[in-house]
Regions:
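Basic/polar N-terminal segments that are highly enriched at the extreme N-terminus
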Residues: 1-3, 309
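Generic N-terminal amphipathic, Lys/Arg-enriched alpha-helix
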Residues: 4-21, 277-281
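Alpha/beta enzyme core
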Residues: 4-12, 27-52, 60-76, 84-207, ...
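Acidic-and-aromatic substrate-binding clefts and catalytic sites of carbohydrate-active enzymes
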Residues: 55
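Short catalytic/ligand-gating loop segments at beta-alpha or beta-beta junctions
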Residues: 211-215
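C-terminal alpha-helical cap/extension of soluble enzyme domains
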Residues: 226, 237-309
Length: 309
């Protein structure tokens, strides 16, 4: 089975009132853990590659690992470019075999964002590739994406409609209060569900995307800190809020920080408890299992995407 796009995935998710997890990948163990969970849960799956992942591993290596996962499991997997910052990066990934790309022009003025997005949409659609765009800016840090809280802006519903109509993008990442990184809220977590509902009502049937949606699972934070880490104050998006978002037209929920925490917590624990171990397989194997268990939980209890294939 070849890589697949998201159009049919999102149609089913929207109609079924659930969301599909888009998990950021950086190496073999992360890919294996995520894919094993998707196979066990029979869940649709998006694997996505950020600027940091491309710099770290090279998207060609990651592409081959994803192709191996498809050959091994037979799962329908979408390979997505996360936060493509310009036309050339999106073009390279379209030409390289990605089935979905994101053009992130959210830091630019509205008209410039439209023009950037429209150009990518035209190129990608001619080659059968779907395009995600972004309107509104999330605070926080994720690889090359860094936005101060003072520069963050929520998505304007009226602009969202105009943006989709003028660009032809296939899905839209919106800002309703989530943020990148492990420190998403200083106080009580809040998402603007009234804004989300308004956007959904104004764009009926249209798939929306939430970035910065890791829960920053407390047990992983505690384990990291217990075994030498320093993640005081880390806080994410409560799982019940993410489950609710899937009922309001959010078809894709991005998860990265929770993967990092699952792997790091497991490795820290293993090396403290087994100080004589130096074979990477000894600590990467349980880390891979930790990722698999966490992703399976997300699919089953948060995204509601289990048994949707």
């Amino acid at each position: 089975m070849p890589l697949v796009g998201t159009k049919e995935m999102f149609k089913k998710a929207y109609e079924g009132g659930y969301a599909i997890g888009a998990f950021n990948v950086n190496n073999m163990e992360i890919i294996q853990g995520i894919v094993a969970a998707a196979k066990a849960e029979q869940s649709p799956l998006i694997l996505q590659v950020s600027a940091g992942a491309r710099k770290y591993a090279n998207h060609i290596y990651l592409m081959k690992l994803v192709e191996a996962a498809i050959e091994d499991t037979g799962l329908p997997i979408c390979l997505h470019l996360d936060h493509g910052e310009d036309f050339e990066i999106c073009k390279a990934c379209v030409d390289g075999g990605f089935t979905s790309v994101m053009i992130d022009g959210s830091k630019h003025p509205f008209e410039e964002n439209i023009e950037m997005t429209r150009r990518v949409v035209e190129y990608a659609h001619e080659r059968g590739v779907v395009v995600e765009a972004e309107l509104g800016r999330l605070a926080g840090v994720e690889d090359a994406v860094k936005v101060n809280s003072k520069d963050a802006t929520y998505t304007d519903p009226d602009q969202a409609v105009e943006f989709v109509e003028r660009t032809g993008c296939d899905s839209l990442a919106i800002a309703i209060g989530t943020s990148h990184g492990a420190y998403k809220f200083k106080g009580k977590p809040e998402l603007d569900f009234a804004r989300l509902e308004k956007i959904t009502n104004m764009l009926p049937g249209y798939p929306l995307v939430l970035h910065g949606a890791s829960t920053v699972i407390p047990s992983f934070v505690e384990e990291c800190n217990k075994y030498g880490g320093k993640l005081d104050g880390a806080q994410g998006v409560p799982e019940d809020m993410l489950l609710q978002a899937g009922k309001f037209g959010v078809c894709k929920i991005n998860i990265d920080t929770d993967l990092r925490l699952a792997m790091t917590a497991s490795i820290r624990k293993h090396l403290v408890e087994n100080p004589g171990d130096f074979d990477p397989r000894q600590y990467l194997k349980p880390a891979r299992q930790a990722i698999q268990d966490m992703v399976a939980h997300k699919m089953r209890d948060v995204l509601n995407s289990s048994n949707r294939l």
